[in-house]
């Protein structure tokens, strides 16, 4: 109730017109004011005055801008003889205008449009190259970057038959594909690289494990023996199930050969149980290791795989 009384007692505040409305109002006043002096008509305006009225009567729904376009096209098609009377009339009107308004000076009005059409659609930040050379260099640079990215993806895919080993390559710090750095081959020799063929074979054996449901035993080792081996690769020999990661071979040579009998026995004896385990279990495991050893010495199957006769 009190708020209603306050609003009734307060006088209404005078509304101030905005800047755009005030400018348009002043322009309309200048146009309609009798003191404003118009420019004298030129020959085209003299000719189009009658033609515009005629065309507007014929096409009442046509916009004024479209009428102006058509009148301009028709004026250009007229010959000099047809334009001559309108040119003379424009000269007479100009002389009369100068006589009536000797102090008249044409002052063009400021245009309200701030952005031109071509400035409106230009890309910000100079994204377009200023010259052809810069444009070609930019295109070449982006094309080269795309090729390098594509080669990197192929390098990640090469040497791995299963898609699950793609992350393993980044974790092990494997260098880029040898085909990319063929000219840097002497410099990359001291670096430890992994045997691509061994990794390929082990991934195939793991896929066979997934399909058949039975573990397979891979015996792909290099000639350097136990000091170059990692614990993961030695554990894959004794365990009955294949590990998820392929064995890491730190040798730079890509040749493979079956391990000697003594080295294999030393590696297996490292994992044999001590005195706390019953003797029967130890004897059975020793018998199993001797079976693997004899199978590796006697003969291997296709691609170095062992026969599954013990299963």
Curated annotation (Swiss-Prot):
Q: What induces it?
A: By bmp-antagonism. By chordin.
Compositional bias, Low complexity, is annotated for 18-32, 233-255
Q: Classify the source by domain of life.
A: Eukaryota
Q: In which tissues is it expressed?
A: By mid-gastrulation (stage 11), strongly expressed on the dorsal side of the embryo and by stage 13, expression marks the future neural plate including the neural crest. During neurulation, neural precursors showing expression converge to form the central nervous system and eye. At stage 23 (early tailbud), expressed in the primitive brain and optic vesicle, with expression high in the anterior neural tube. In the tail bud brain, expressed in several patches along the anterior-posterior axis in the telencephalon, midbrain-hindbrain boundary and hindbrain.
Keyword Flavoprotein assigned to the entry: answer is: no
- List the keywords (alphabetical): Activator, Developmental protein, Differentiation, DNA-binding, Neurogenesis, Nucleus, Transcription, Transcription regulation
The cellular location(s) given in this protein's UniProt record come to: Nucleus
What function does the entry list?
Answer: Transcriptional activator. Functions as a switch in neuronal development, participating in the differentiation of embryonic neuroectodermal cells into neural tissues by making the ectodermal cells responsive to FGF-neuralizing signals. Downstream SRRT target that mediates the promotion of neural stem cell self-renewal.
Q: What is known of its domains?
A: The 9aaTAD motif is a transactivation domain present in a large number of yeast and animal transcription factors.
Record-given protein name: Transcription factor Sox-2
The organism of origin for this protein = Xenopus laevis
């Amino acid at each position: 109730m009190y708020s209603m009384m306050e609003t009734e007692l307060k006088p209404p505040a005078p509304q101030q017109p905005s800047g755009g409305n005030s400018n348009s109002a002043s322009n309309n006043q200048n146009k309609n004011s009798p003191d404003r002096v118009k420019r004298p008509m030129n020959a085209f305006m003299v000719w189009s005055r009658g033609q515009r009225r005629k065309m507007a009567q014929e096409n009442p729904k046509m916009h004024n801008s479209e009428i102006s376009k058509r009148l301009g096209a028709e004026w250009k098609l007229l010959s000099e003889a047809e334009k001559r009377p309108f040119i003379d009339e424009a000269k007479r009107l100009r002389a009369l205008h100068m006589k009536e308004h000797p102090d008249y000076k044409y002052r063009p009005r400021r245009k309200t449009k701030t952005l031109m059409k071509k400035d409106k659609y230009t890309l910000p930040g100079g994204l377009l190259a200023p010259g052809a050379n810069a444009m070609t260099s930019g295109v070449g640079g982006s094309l080269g970057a795309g090729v390098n990215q594509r080669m990197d993806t192929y390098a990640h895919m090469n040497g791995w038959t299963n898609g699950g080993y793609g992350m393993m390559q980044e974790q092990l710090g494997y260098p880029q594909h040898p085909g990319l750095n063929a000219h840097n081959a002497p410099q990359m020799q001291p670096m430890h690289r992994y045997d691509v063929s061994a990794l390929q074979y082990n991934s195939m054996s793991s896929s066979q494990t997934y399909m058949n449901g039975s573990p397979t035993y891979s015996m792909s080792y290099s000639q350097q023996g136990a000091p170059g081996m990692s614990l993961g690769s030695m554990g894959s020999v004794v365990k009955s199930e294949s590990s998820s990661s392929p064995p890491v071979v730190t040798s730079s040579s890509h040749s493979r050969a079956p391990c000697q009998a003594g080295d294999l026995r030393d590696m297996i004896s490292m994992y044999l149980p001590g005195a706390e385990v019953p003797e029967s279990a130890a004897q059975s495991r020793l018998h199993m290791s001797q079976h693997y050893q004899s199978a590796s010495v006697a003969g291997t199957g296709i691609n170095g795989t062992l026969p599954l006769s013990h299963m």
